[in-house]
Structure formats: C-alpha cells, structure tokens
Amino acid sequence: MAIRYGTDASETINGDNTADMVFAGGGNDTVNGKFGGDQIFGDVGNDTLDGGFQNDMIDGGEGADKIYGGSGDDMLAGGLGADTLTGDLGDDIFTVGELTELTGDKIDGGIGRDTMMISFEDSAKGITFTAADPTKSTSFYGATITGIEQFFITGSDKAADNLTGGRWTDMLTGGGGDDRLTGNGGTDILSGGLGNDILSGGQGSDMLSGDEGDDQLSGSYGHDTLEGGTGNDKLDGGNGIDFLKGEAGNDTLLGGNGMDTLDGGEGNDTIDGGADNDTITAGAGLDKVIAGSGNDTVKMTINQGKDTVDGGTGTDRIDISGISGTFTAKAANLTNTLSDGTTIINIEDYTLRGSSGTDKFTTLGGTDYLYGEGGNDTLKAGAGNDFVYGGIGNDAIYGEDGNDYLDAGKGKDIISGGTGTDTAVIDASDLGTTAVTFSVSGNKGTLSNGTTTTDVEIYKITTASGNDVLKAGTAQQVVFNTGKGNDQLFGGNGSDQLNAGEGNDKIDGGAGNDTISDTGGNNTITAGDGNDTVTVDVLAASAGGDKTTVDLGTGNDRVEFNDGIGSTAGVFTANGGTGTDHAVIDRSKSTANLTFTLGTHAVLTNGNVTLDNFESVTIKGGSGKDVFKGGNLNDTFMGNAGDDDLQGLGGNDLLYGGAGKDKLTGGDGNDSIWGNNGSDDAAADTLSGGNGNDNLYINNGDTASGGTGTDSLYLDLSNVTTGVSFNFGTGTVKVNGTTSFTEMERLDFKGTTSNDTVKGGTLNDVLRGNAGNDVLDGNSGDDTLYDGKGNDTLKGGEGNDTLIREDFTGKDIFDGGNGTDTLSFAISGDTSVKLDLLNNALNDGMALGLTVTSIEKVIGSGKDDDIAGANVAEQIFGGDGGDALNGRGGNDTLNGGLGADKLTGGTGNDTFVFDDYSSAGDFVTDFKRGEDKIALDLSEFGLASNYKLLLVQGADPVATTTGATFFYETDTNRLWYDADGNGGDEEMHLVATFDKVASLSTSDFLFV
C-alpha cells in the first residue's frame, strides 16, 4: 500500500492502480484514489475526495467536503461541516460520529444497498425513527438523505425509543427504556437492551434479542432467531423455521408455523410448538410443554423439574436423559409419570438415556432409541425399527418386531433380534490375545466370550489380537474386523466386509459382492463368487518373508496392494478367475528394473508379483528402468523415475512417464500420455498416441507423435528461458532444437519466459503467453488465448475466440478477428477494469495499455468495472461487483451480474438481462419501451420453463395470487419480484429501477 502525504496547501493528489493511503493535510485538496481499495483522510479544508474503484474508506474531516465513493462498497464519513456525500455504485456505509456532523449534509447513497450508521445513545430524549423510501429525499437530523436502504441505529440509553426499519436489512438497538423496534422487510437485527421491550421482525429472517426486562418478541415471517434474555419474556416465532430461546425467567414460547426449535432455558416456562415438526427442550424449572401438531421431539433431563408434556397430534418423540431404574412406556393416549413427577401423554416414540447402574427399559411400537450406558441393563424396544445400545456391562437386548439395530457394546450380552431384518454389533476388542470364535447356525449366533444372539440377520463384530475364527454361517451379511493374530474369516452369501490385521490369515468371502482387506503375514484369500474388492497391505511386515495368495473367483473383481508388495521379502500371487478383473500394483519404492506384460499368466519380473486371468492393471513403477505392457482394456502405468518403456496397447490407457528418458506408446484407444507426472522433466521423452483420439502432455526436450485420430498436444514450456516460434500443423513441427511433434490436431500451449510466436491450427486451441513479448495467433477454430506478462499481441483469427487478459503491466494488442469473439477479465485478480472499446486511450485498471479490435463480447472482472462498448452490437457482462456498463450504439445485451449495477444501453434495440436479485437491484438509465427488452433468467428466479409472466403495476401494486409475481411501481420506477405473490412467506426483491419509465407491459419482457 502506497502512503501519500499532502501539505497544508491546496493540492491535487492522485492514487494509482493499487491501494493507497492518503493524508491530504490542510487546504482545499482534491484526492483521486483511482483503482484499489483506498483510505483517504481529508483533514481540515473544503476537500473533494473521490475513492474511484473498489472498496474505499474516506473521512472528510473538518470543512465543507465533497466526497464520492465511486464504485465498490465504500465507507464514508463527512466529519464537521456541511458536506456532500455520494456513494455512487456499491453497497456503501455512511458513518456519523456525532449528531452535529449531520448539520447541512447532503447524503446520496446512489446505486446499491447503502447503510447509515448512527448512535443516539447519549440523547436525553427517546428517538422516534421510521426508515423512508430510498427513492425519496427526507430530512434526517439536519441532513438531507436519499438513496439509503438500511439503517444501523442505536437508540437512547436514557429513554424509550420507537425505531422502524424499511424493506432491507436494519440493525436497531433500543438501549434503555421500554423500546418498540420493528424490522419490517429484510434480515434485521433487533436488540431491546434494558427495559420491557416490544420487538417485531416483520418479513425476512431476523435476529431478535430481548436482553434484560420482560420483553415481547415476534418473528412474524421468515426464519427467525429469538432470544428472550433475562426476565419473563414472550416469544412468538410466527411463520418460518424459527429458533426460540427463552433463557432465564418464566417465559412463554410459541413456535407458530414451521419446523421450529424451542428452548425454554431456566424458569417455569410454557412452550407451544405449534404446527409442523418442532424440537423442544425443557430446561430447569416447572415447564409446560405442548408440542402441537406435527412430528415433534421433546428433550428433557430428569430431576430438573416437574414438567407436563403433551405431544399433541402426530408421531412425537420424547428424549429423556439421566433416567435410571425401570421404565415402561404406556400407550400414547395414557399418562406416563416419571420418577420426578413429570407427566407425559401423546408420545409415540422414546429416546431413553440410562445411567451407570442397572436399568430396565421397555417401549412399545414406534422407532425408539434406548441407551443402557453402564451397568447390566435389560432393554426391550418393542415393535418398530429401533436402535438399542447396551454400553458397558452384561446386557440383555431385545429388538422384537421391526428392523432393529442392536449394539451390545462390551460384555457378555444376550441379543435377540425378533422379527424383521436385525443388525447386531458386538465389541470384543477388550479381550486382548484371547482367541475369539464366532459362528451362526440357523437363527442362533455364539461368541466364545459368552455372548449369544437369536434371530439376528446382520453382524458387525470387532475383536482384538488373538487367533480368531469368525464364521458368517447362515447370516445374511457380516462385517468382521480383527486385529493382530492368525485369523480365519469366513463370509456368507451376502455382501460381506472382512478385514484382518497383521498375522497369517485365511479369508474366504463366500458368495456376494465382498470387500476384503488384510495386513501383513502369510495370507490366503479366497474372494468367492460376486464382484469383490480385495486390498492387501504388507508394508509393515514385508521384511518377514510374507506370502499372500488371492483367488478372486467369479465376477468382475479388483485386487489392490501397496508399495510394500514385491520387495525381496514378500511374494504376491493372484488369480482373477472368471469375469473382467483389475489389479493395482504399487511398486513406487522399488529400485529394481521391473518388467510386466499383461496376459493370461503375467509376472512382474523383479517385483515378486504373479497375476493370472486379469484383464487390466494399474502399476506404479519405482526408480528403475521399467517396461510395462498392457492389454485390450483400460490400463494405467506410472513409470516414476528411471528410463521407462510404457505401452498401453488396446483400451483407453493412462501413461505417466515421470522423471527419466521415457518411451510412452498408447496404442489403440483414446489414451492420455504424460511425459512427466505433471512437473517439469529435463529428460527427453518420446510419446506416441497410436490409433484413437489421444491427449499427449510434453515439455521441453520431448518428441510427440499423435498417430491417427484427433489428437491434442499439451506443450508446457513455462520453465524455458529461450523463446520459441512455430506454426501448428499436421506435419512435423520443430518447436526448438530439442522439442518436436507430428500428427497432432489440437494445441494447448504454455509459453516460455521469453518472446514466443505461435500460430494455432484449425481446431479449438489454447495458447498461453506466459512472460515475454508474445505473438499468439489462434488461426481458425474457437480458440482461447492468454496474454501473460510483457507486451503481447493476441489474434483470435477465424472462429468464436476468447481473449483473456491476466496481466496489465504490458502494452497488449487484442484482435478478435472474425466470428463472435470475447474479451475476458474474469481471472484478472483484485484490480477493476475500465474499458472503452471506442476510445482505447481511456483504458485503465486491468485494461491499462490494452488496444482492442474486433471484440463482440466483454466479460468483466470479479470487482467493480466501468465498461463502454463501441457503436456496434455487443454483449457486456459485468460479473461480480457494482459495474457501470454502457452499450453505446448497436443492439447491445447488458448483464450486470452480481451486485447493483448501472446499465446504459445507448442507441439501438438493447436487451437488459437480470439473473440475480440478491442485491439492491440494478439501475437502468435509458430503457425505451418498444425498442429495448427486459430479459429474465428463469432458472435464477426459480421459475419453470413454462412460466407465464404475471405483472402487477401501479403506485402501490398488490399481488392477486400466491404465484410468482413481478411488480412495477409506477411512482418510483422500480421492478420487484415476489416468489409467492401474496403468500406472505417470501419477501419482495428489487430487480431493477428503470429511470423515467412510467409503466411496463408483458411485451417488454422476454425469458432466457
């Protein structure tokens, strides 16, 4: 950030294209921030301060100052004196330190969602304030304001305030006294402070805080958050999905419509969930809970008060913590009394969280959650799909009817699933080296620690480090997880997961699509029928002379093993069996010269891997000179270091040469071939695509041949310091003394750090200049060209090309050529764009030094831009930020994008596109009915493709249906959108203001 200091004399200080900090000093100064987010301090004197582009902070100081925010979200303070403050484009904030600073000020927020921040906390009198329509000028404590949408106001600490917001987001703080705060539209923040306050959010998703006192909070429409604070408060959520928290005091909480969350907090509270599915928490105190209609959940902790709970209609749940001893649920229409005197009625589902002692819970129908925690518990879930957790101890768990999930935890447990498809979870991880056996016969399962099961279909069992034998038997499905030890795992007919740890293991998957993993040891794995996946990790034990044999059986299977495999201490043998099978071999740590040719019987020479009946492979080589040959399907070979020879043969193969002088041959199929692994490689690689549409990636020193098909060359010379010059063609092209290619149809080029001259081919090429004074010519096709640093010349040629400016330090020439060509600043970083297609001498910011011809479409940056077209038809898209777009002559299409934009079509039949209404709306300066059109993006407005425009207009237009409606205010020239018409739940959103346009009709609109 450049820091600039003025003197006490009157002077002019100009910023640059970066962020400046300017202290103007005394005198009547003129300061122009220009580009960048500037900080400007006027000090004493009648100053003229202009922030220019981006988000500026300007303080006028003493004197009658003229302050212009320019584009961007600016923060403006006039200081003492009769000041003129203009926000212009962007969401600006006007701050006032003392009320006397407002005297004589003229404040205009301009275009955007602008905010006035002011505090009256020292006022002896209460403040009465109502936000005015921003289109109208109004007197405000000695100032004249217009164009202010939002107010952040702090009321008096000494008296009662009455503060009312507008259609946008307001922040109103009451201070002392019994205040009345009304948010109206927008996402408002209301804080009552001291006193007995009345807060109403209105439309929008508001946040209301009563703070101290006996407060009344009403959310009304929207998804609101209401917090009562201390005192006996009344909270009413209204419509929407609301969060209500009573906090301390005897509070009344009303959820209203919507799926609300209500928390009474401390005190004797009355909580009414209202309609929909609510979540209610009864805290400490004697609470009365009426869940209302819907499927509600009531949460409570026993012994915090004698509560009354009525679930109301719907399927309701009660969640009770700290319950101990015996509890038996009753029918929903009967009253159930807890040990602390709490009564429950109209509850269908239970969540019971037990104690460390011996608990006995019995529930009826419904979906119940029972937690035994510690102790020897008896848990009976009854009918329904239940979840039961025994915890530590010797528990008896009964799922009974339904598809139940029964987690016994640690201990000697009894598990009974009952009818339905039930799952048992057994944790034997505390048994250490003790061998564990498990088997299922008929409807009974037996674990050697004494745990028994009855009528369970699915098992999940975890053991420790003994020599375990786990058999699925007649189970539908199993998940076995064993640790160290010589284990035997047998799957069943389902899709099982069998995971063995270190040790000499035997695994049989059985039928079904199984997932099998093993770690270390001399292992025998039989996958069985089905499409199985086997992963072997012997890295930790590769020094122990391990041997692993895998038989995948029938099905389309996959086997994978890590870079420990193939060391001199380990041997791996796999048979794919029938089906289409794939093997993944990681030998990236090997130093040997590996060779492999895929076939019915294939051996990874020097890698101790044998594969039979595999149809495709993925192999990662090490630092040796590897030779890998694939088959007819899709193979992946990674050579890594060393001079490798990789041949894909048939299929769509992926070949990565890595470091070294590699020879890479794709063969048939659409292959992708990298001479390196995504990084620079000084060695000279030879790449051959063969038949098919191939992608070849090379850098300096490599040779590439595409072969037949439509092949793409990705040439990266970004680390080369000597420039190149070549024309892309079908014959042999010599890029420099060491790099060449032939039989390529498409080019993706990254230039050197010096001066490059490159001409593309007939297809859609990508040319990146990098550093240096480059000349890039796309030739024909729809090409994409990037300038980079230096004085560059970009020529699109034939086709619909895109020319992208990444750097503004050079003097560049962009010529789109024939076709509909695009100039884009979309990836230009943090600098705004000032572009004039008619007078390039005015170009500045990211367009500084740029000469442009034959451009039909412009895409701005992610900041606030000023873009003016020529006297021909153009498409101009502003992108993010508050943009100023001017089409000038021709039939132009203007789209401001995100942010509140200023749009001027100029002469011709222009189209104004609106695909966002999240800001304060765009401002159209010259819409002409009968010539220009308003284009609405249906998808961005959430409208169906067959939507028929519903337009209501007048001085105060009122919706006639609950359907999506557009409103045009004839007195303010504003176009609004309401997704639900007169439904009330959705707010109206400002789309645009059309200057001096008295009315609109449906014929002025079109959909895109």
Predicted regions and their residues:
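Solvent-exposed adhesion/ligand-recognition segments of exported proteins
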Residues: 1, 7, 12, 16, ...
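Low-complexity acidic/polar repeat-biased segments
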Residues: 1-2, 143-152, 161, 344-351, ...
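Glycine-centered beta-turn/loop sites at beta-strand termini
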Residues: 5-6, 15, 24, 33, ...
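Consensus positions within tandem repeat domains that build extended binding/scaffold surfaces
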Residues: 10, 19, 28, 37, ...
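Short "repeat-start/strand-capping" segments in structured domains, especially the N-termini
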Residues: 17-20, 36, 147-151, 167-170, ...
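Extracellular/surface recognition and adhesion modules
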Residues: 24, 107, 148, 309, ...
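Acidic/polar low-complexity surface segments
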Residues: 96-97, 123-142, 328-342, 429-451, ...
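Acidic glycine/aspartate-rich repeat arrays in secreted/surface proteins
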Residues: 122-126, 134, 139, 323-328, ...
